[in-house]
């Protein structure tokens, strides 16, 4: 049975734990790791059948087959290279870290060198399968428009640096428009989907992103438009925010669980 270690015990990490604990996913939940030991222990204590240990990252890496990162972009930079060198497969949720070309090349190189797999869930959007297919023929443009309630954008580096008072917004306001390479740094906890789209499509510099704060919204809305030699397609998702973290869409957690199921399933459906 696949032994899994989860790094990051927030909403997404918790949902994955509960999916394994409830028998929805047939795997061994071996260990948890979080910058807050108490948070990891609290999550472990809430489970009914699984009894994962709390471990420091070095110990966790030595004991598992698959690490699921659901912590932060900094965690990706620090943990994933170590895991790959140790022969662990890794699922990355904080995909925005890979906007760093040097890090991206390092991780892809290590995965190849050590015969490991890197998994990137679709996250809070749909259409990644179509984007993968379209890239085989050639894509001319990819645009992502993300609209969120102001509360879901609080604390983002871009918001803080520009002194934007989100709580005072009375109408829909465009906060950012530019390449995905800049968007994932400006809003690291909000637009990981931009990174996933970039990896599947035409890269971080050519993928265009617009981030909008909309006080009339109660959901996170992601719209993607893709054009190329295949034709054109568009997708729209209205996600309910996580009840624990308004910056995270519930669908992102479900996507991680689905990716884990796909890893374990001998039958693969879709691109």
From Swiss-Prot:
EC nos: 1.4.1.21
Gene Ontology molecular-function annotations: aspartate dehydrogenase activity; NAD binding; NADP binding; oxidoreductase activity, acting on the CH-NH2 group of donors, NAD or NADP as acceptor
Keyword check for Oxidoreductase: yes
Catalyzed chemical reaction(s): L-aspartate + NADP(+) + H2O = oxaloacetate + NH4(+) + NADPH + H(+); L-aspartate + NAD(+) + H2O = oxaloacetate + NH4(+) + NADH + H(+)
Pathway it works in: Cofactor biosynthesis; NAD(+) biosynthesis; iminoaspartate from L-aspartate (dehydrogenase route): step 1/1
Catalytic machinery residues: 222
One Pfam family hit: Asp_DH_C
Residues involved in NAD(+) binding: 124, 192
Keyword hit for rRNA-binding: no
GO biological process: NAD biosynthetic process
Keyword set, alphabetical order: NAD, NADP, Oxidoreductase, Pyridine nucleotide biosynthesis
Function: Specifically catalyzes the NAD or NADP-dependent dehydrogenation of L-aspartate to iminoaspartate.
Miscellaneous section: The iminoaspartate product is unstable in aqueous solution and can decompose to oxaloacetate and ammonia.
Record family assignment: Belongs to the L-aspartate dehydrogenase family.
Name this protein carries in UniProt: L-aspartate dehydrogenase
Source organism: Methanosarcina acetivorans (strain ATCC 35395 / DSM 2834 / JCM 12185 / C2A)
């Amino acid at each position: 049975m696949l032994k899994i270690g989860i790094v990051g015990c927030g909403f997404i990490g918790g949902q994955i734990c509960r999916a394994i604990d409830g028998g929805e996913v047939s795997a061994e939940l071996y260990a948890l790791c979080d910058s807050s030991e108490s948070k990891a222990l609290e999550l472990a204590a809430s489970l009914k059948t699984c009894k994962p240990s709390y471990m420091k990252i070095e110990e966790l890496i030595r004991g598992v087959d698959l690490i699921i990162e659901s912590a932060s972009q900094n965690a990706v930079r620090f943990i994933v290279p170590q895991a790959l060198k140790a022969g662990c497969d890794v699922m990355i949720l904080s995909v925005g870290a890979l906007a760093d070309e040097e890090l991206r090349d390092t991780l892809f190189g290590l995965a190849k060198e050590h015969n490991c797999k890197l998994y990137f869930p679709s996250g809070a959007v749909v259409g990644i399968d179509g984007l993968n297919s379209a890239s085989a023929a050639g894509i001319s443009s990819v645009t992502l428009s993300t609209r969120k309630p102001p509360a879901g954008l609080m604390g983002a580096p871009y918001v803080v640096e520009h002194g934007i008072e989100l709580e005072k917004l009375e109408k829909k306001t465009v906060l950012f428009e530019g390449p995905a390479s800049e968007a994932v740094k400006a809003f690291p906890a909000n637009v990981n989907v931009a990174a996933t789209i970039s990896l599947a499509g035409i890269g971080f510099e050519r993928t265009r992103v617009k981030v909008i704060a909309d006080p009339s919204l109660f959901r996170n809305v992601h719209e993607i438009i893709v054009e190329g030699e295949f034709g054109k397609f568009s997708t729209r998702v209205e996600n309910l925010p996580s009840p624990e973290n308004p910056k995270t869409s519930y669908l992102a957690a479900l996507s991680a669980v689905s990716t884990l199921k796909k890893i374990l399933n001998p039958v693969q459906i879709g691109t």
